[in-house]
Swiss-Prot record:
Gene designation per UniProt: aroB
Binding site for NAD(+): 60-65, 94-98, 118-119, 131, 140, 158-161
Protein's name according to its UniProt entry: 3-dehydroquinate synthase
Gene3D superfamilies named in the record: 3.40.50.1970, Dehydroquinate synthase-like - alpha domain
PANTHER family for the chain: 3-DEHYDROQUINATE SYNTHASE (PTHR43622), 3-DEHYDROQUINATE SYNTHASE, CHLOROPLASTIC (PTHR43622:SF7)
Location of this chain's protein in the cell: Cytoplasm
Amino acid sequence: MQVEVKLKENAYKVYIDELEELEFDSKVFILSNPKISGLHLKTLLSKIKAKEIFIATVKDGEEYKNLSTMEEILNQMFNSKLDRKSVLISFGGGVISDMGGFAASIYQRGIDFINIPTTLLACVDAAVGGKTGVNNNFGKNLIGTFYQPKAVYCESSFLKTLSFRELAAGMAEFIKMAAMFDDSILDFIEKIDEKSFLNATCENEIFTQIIARSIELKSRVVEQDEKESGLRMLLNYGHTFAHVIENFTDYKLYLHGEAVAIGMVMANQLALNLGLLDKMQSQKIKDILLKFGLPISYKINNVDEFYEAFFMDKKSSNKKINFVLASPLGKGFIKGDISKEDIIATLREFQ
């Protein structure tokens, strides 16, 4: 199956379960991590033909997605003597996708790159759309670029080696999209047999359906708003809270999807307090998240510090915090005129 991301410039295709032989008349630089390399690199190498193939592995995890690791990647690219015709392949989860795309975008002012995601989260979200970047002490993804891949290959067979926790984290991003754009997808999610899914014993068909539906939805959003000036901001539902949680826990306590799950619950509580979302719909999201074993609570130790951290969010402007909310489920919107008192009151409910 193929889904085309129809951008005015740099259009590309997402191939779902269609990874066949890839031929390059250039050098290829594969960026991955030790775990994925051990599990799947042999399979990938059997499908690539190129002038030369270089392999680099870096530690995986949000705590390593920083400028220090980026410098390490760039040094390996220079040591490999890549030129502007070379191709970088990001082979891993969302962290590898973000860093690989960023490295490709700044190496010699830009070389081609391909995403081959190996986690559900990367398949449904991170690998498509052209967002690249790294974290720093001030927050998440504050250093980066918009740089589209030349192609994306999502292979559901790679997902079979994921843990219960990793699969659930990917589902959080899928739930996010449904809550923002299409509540019928929430009905689809509710019907999934979570036991077989989370134990990765189901047929590839379920993964394929999830990936296809999410990519079709996200591609339509990116086509309308590639640089995140309006509609695409809705894909940050739950992320305003999640990024603060991740930063405050040094990116070690939660997987990104887990933090997003908590962030959605917090965003819904804010919407509920403002009279924009009813209690039944707020509970529906909680129930779906719990169905997949995702966390729905976080203890805020210092409400004022948490509030101030919002202002490092990329969606904040003119000293206002733009929150992405659902009202009702399936219809997201951005609200930037919420008083400090209302925000603080919601945060206090999580102390």
